[in-house]
Amino acid sequence: MTEGTDASRKRILLIYGGHAGGRTEQLVAAVQQGISAADEPIELRSLPALQAGVEDLLWAQGLLIGTPEHFGYMSGAVKDFMDRTFYPVEGKVQGLPYAVFISAGNDGTGAANAIARIAIGYQWQEIAPPLIVKGAVTQAALQQCIELGQTMAAGLALGIF
């Protein structure tokens, strides 16, 4: 990952919910590592969902969403981000490539399905199936997150998405 705002640099927004030191934070760090490892000129804006807003979403050329599963749903912080940004960006973010990663105590499908339904309203383009990490975070799960970050970075840089 490179810093700066050169026009050739692709821009990824990574938003996430969860608690400091939690499993989702471990996954976020791995996704960031994957983006950083890319040879492509990428600018990453990584923010807790409660701090991200309309300007961040309009800035993004790719979106990664990390959330814990809370009671079979996405985190309140991620839902709040979507509630605050939907109408202000309506009609302005169609086709935005996105992917989701979820730390789940259950099966994670409720959170994944809810985000997918909302993404249809935004008219985003899903670039990968939801990455659901059930239970403890393993090295294999971290590797999948690294690969998700690399996929987004490479896909944007190569014009695939």
What label would you give each PLM region?
Residues 49-126:
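Helix-loop-strand module that forms the ligand-binding subsite of alpha/beta enzymes
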Residues 28-41, 120-125:
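Short helix-loop-beta junction
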Residues 2-8, 38, 53, 126-161:
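Glycine-rich phosphate/pyrophosphate-binding loop and the adjoining helix
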Residues 2-36:
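N-terminal beta1-alpha1 ligand-phosphate binding loop
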Residues 13, 43-45, 99:
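A structural signal for isolated positions on well-ordered beta-strands in alpha/beta enzyme cores
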Residues 24-27, 77, 111, 141-144:
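Residues at alpha-helix caps and immediate loop-helix transition turns in enzyme cores, especially N-
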Residues 18-21, 103-107, 132-138:
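Short histidine/acidic/glycine/proline-rich micro-motifs that form metal-
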Residues 40-51:
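A short beta-strand-loop structural module common to alpha/beta enzyme folds
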